[in-house]
Structures are given as C-alpha cells and as structure tokens.
Amino acid sequence: MKRTYVGPSGNREAKLGCCGEQPGVQEVRASPPRPFVGPAGQGMDECLQMTRIPRLEMYLTNVIKDLDAPLSHYINLTSQGKYTISKEGYQYIQGLGEELKSLDLNVIVAFGNIALIALTNRVGITKWRGSVLESTIVPGLKVVPTFHPATFIPPKFNFLNKPLICEDLLRAKYESEFKEIRRTRRNIRIKRGFRESVDTLNYCYEIGLRGQTIDIDIEVINGEVDCIAFAWSPTD
C-alpha cells in the first residue's frame, strides 16, 4: 500500500493539460494533496501568468503519483540518454494512459524528460521541446514537451529555461484550440552539388541584404562541421 498519493487536479473539461514527473513534499502535505503547489508549481504559475493561461482552466497531473520512492526507482534516466522502467513505473504509465483517455484534452504539456518518456516513448527534452508530438499511450493526443519549471528555480537556476517554457506554453495554448495534428509541408533539398550549393549561398546572401531572416542549423561531430542547413521560410 502506498504511504503517499497525489492525484490529478484541475478542470476535467479542459482542452489543455500539463503533466509533471512526480509530486514533491509540498504536494504530499497539501490539504488535499494535489500537484504543482510547491516551488516548481510556483514557477509554473509564473509562466502561466506570463502567457495568460488560467490555471483553473487546465488539467494537472503527474506520471508518478507518489513520493514513497525516488523518481529513479520508477523511471531511471542515465546521463547517456538511456532509460529503464520498473514494473511499478510501467503500471503508472499505463494508469496515466487510462486517466488521459477519460478526458477530452487536445494537447498536454510534458514537463521534463520523464513526462516525455511516459507520454511519447522519446527521450531528450532539449531536442524535442516545443515540438508537437503524438502520444504513444493516448493515440491522437498532442504532446508539447518543455523543460520542467524546477530547472529555473533553486538550486538549478537555469534562468534561460523560463522564456523557453513560456514559448512552449504558448505553442500548447494554440494547439489546444483544435484536435487534429497539423503538419507543415516542407520543401527539403539535400545533397546539393557544388554549383547548387554556391547558388543557394548567393540567394541567402541576396535576400539577407533585403532584411529577410535566414535560419542556419550547423551540425558538429567530433569538433568538425558535418553539415549546414539554411532555411529562408517556414517551408523552404
């Protein structure tokens, strides 16, 4: 039998939800116990205020619902990006799926790597944050991963995560307005020849002089530039 348990809270009719990792001491001691009322919850509230998202209109939950054991007991994530899930961890993930299937959410925000793993079976919050993914435990449910609010408060103090969380919350707010997953069609051209590459660089230079923004993505492997990508519009 569990010594501690913190169930979900919020609006069960909501279109937008947030999923954290595990309750903390303040959540367990709250009366009644509920998620996101500790320091990380206060950080989340600050982000919600900045993005004008009413907390009362959201559904809030966690992957792990107790504080009987450390998070790594349920889902253990290594520094190499590998993870293992215990039997109890699988039970919680399965329960989360049933919980979310009973709702009518359009999108849920995954706070942190553990929520990302549970909801999408993916790992790498820095890589996936801000993306719109489909949940693997609730088909059709959109998931927007972002950093956990605990990352920008003591003791971690990663202050730059706060505006990124706000940006991702705004993305989730927009996605909550409709059910379907909308994909942008992109024209991607790869393995360009020398002449085509020079022409592309000249084109980027010319439109850059006219004030158009050029996005550049540089991939570095073992300290050497492996490839460079240029984008001059959301589709090209």
Positions of predicted regions on the chain:
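A polyanion-binding, active-site-adjacent surface
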Residues: 1-182
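Conserved RNase H-like, two-metal-ion catalytic cores of nucleic-acid enzymes
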Residues: 31-35, 41-45, 51, 183-236
